[in-house]
Amino acid sequence: VITVVGHADLTAQTLKLLETELSDRLRCLAQPGSMVLVRAGCGLPVAAGRAARRARLPLVVVLPSQDAVPALLPGRDQAAAGELLFLAAHVRLLPYDPADRDACASADERLVYSSSRLLAVWDGSPAHDQDATADVIASAHGRRIATETLWAPGYARHSRSPSSDEPS
């Protein structure tokens, strides 16, 4: 299983570029029986799902659950989840709160622990209250899970304003 995680605030241009790069990397890394695993959400998970389809690899989508029933995703992630479910060969339920950053980071770590390889889209920045990508990568390294980070010239994230750290 190849898990794909990364920044949630990638620009549209970066996501387009990533679809191609991820597809190429997935083709190179794929072994017989390989699958691609993502946590449902907008942005990178959709790019990874499309890349898995291009690479002809089955996609496993993880949805949040409460009491073994799928939980409602935040509004911006709902349409993306629909596309991911269309692309998915398998769906897994995982108990976590999709509106809680720490719960999402913990869910990502559980995905990584169940995989043989991590593909992380990461610009090298430290973790902060809106992004735990660095922590997930450190956790994978601690578990000796093969990890590859992707960040090419031209990739960008949306600018963070000082008020973006405040809950909405």
Predicted regions: what is each one?
Residues 1-167:
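Acidic/glycine-enriched connector segments
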